[in-house]
Amino acid sequence: MYERVYVSVGSRAPNFTLKDENDRDISMDTLRKGRKLVLAFVKGIDDAHTREQIDYLKDDFERFQFHGADVLMVTSGNVKFNRTMHDNHKLPFHMLSDQRCDIIRQYGLYNEYNKLLGPAIFVLNDAGVVVFMSVGKNPWDIMEDEEIIKVLEGDTQTPPGWPEM
């Protein structure tokens, strides 16, 4: 059964705090610090699709930073899994554990059969507003980084009339 999407383009992304690959509490808003953010959700399993999404984001990390964005990844895996993936792939960004799928549910990505619908990418502007989202229905629905870069290059400022943080 699929749950409805709770976050959409134009809405403020809900903040959350989860454990990172080193078992430290990381808050999305604290990490973001008023910068743009590429927020990625992947399954907590070590398969070809998860590795592909991780490697895409790692390979273009410097390009994301050039455009003023950080990267944060949320998985349904535990801290130990995330530590292994983080170390094996030498990731320059944090992997957060949402093993109970609380945040995955909050973002409308939960599927009771697989825990996560498919890989998902949310791009947040500097005010924390979602300016782009891509939610895969299958594990192989992996977002191309070029599309993310185009979003970051474009106007991702807060829409007029949106409350300041």
Feature map (PLM): residue ranges:
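Chalcogenol-based redox active-site neighborhoods
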Residues: 1-165
